[in-house]
Amino acid sequence: MKNNFFYKKPLSNIYKKPSEVSEVTSQIIYGEKFKILSKNKNWIKIKSSFDNYIGYIKNKNYTDSHKPTHKVFVLKANIFNKTKNKTKYFLPYASKISIIQVNKKLIEIEKGKWIKKKYVKKINHIEKDYLSVLKLFLKTKYIWGGKTYKGIDCSAILQLLYYYNNKFYPRDTKDQLRFSKSSVKRKNYKKGDVIFWKGHVAICIDAKNLIHAYGPEKKVIIMSINKTIEIIERTTRLIVKKISSIRY
């Protein structure tokens, strides 16, 4: 039997241990593929098919039959009910959906669940304008382990660029640091440079500024590159470990 499953709710926390008081290490979003390593009545231990991330989620809200045809390319896509009225639920950026039927403005993704047609792209679409994606998350609150509009951490905002484009990239900063190819250390930064510290990462949006999910500011924010490097060194005694760049 094939061990391939897909998450079918907007999002869920992934826990380090099978307990809601355990550390939240990441999240799983709608349409994300995973394998089940073990399970009991309440919990399943999963391994993400995208990045091999391992953790625990509640033993519910998943299926083995899901063939994604499109994906969400806005920060959050409001879900409409069968009467075409808005609900309080949203699909997060990069959710992978199957289209059941289409009308003039909406697409049905599950029976009685619709989202706006203009909010999706085909599953094989490659988004090259990574700055527009990064800026979707501006002012999103910082949450350790988060990777959606409800909250996001520094490594997730970088990984989502690759996840959307169906390209492998690790989840945690320590693994991203090892995986990323190093550029020559320099003081002249450019758009697309990725700056790594121990436990933190930021992306340059031009020669002078960067964007990152920054814990001390509790949100995704644009800051001066040089100021950020100075603040991090002064407050944490951490220096830049590697400069890489975004490569699709």
Name each model-derived stretch.
Residues 51-62, 110-123, 222:
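A short macromolecule-binding patch
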Residues 134, 146-165:
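Active-site nucleophilic cysteine motif
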Residues 167-226:
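...with weaker cross-activation on analogous glycine-rich loops/strands in unrelated enzymes
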Residues 22, 84-85, 183:
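Short, solvent-exposed loop/turn positions at domain surfaces
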Residues 44, 89-120:
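Extended acidic/polar, glycine-enriched regions
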Residues 1-18, 27-28, 37-40, 47-50, ...:
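SH3-family beta-barrel domains
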Residues 31, 92-97, 189-192:
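Loop/turn positions that initiate beta-strands
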Residues 114-142, 164-165:
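A short mid-domain helix/strand-loop element embedded in enzyme catalytic domains
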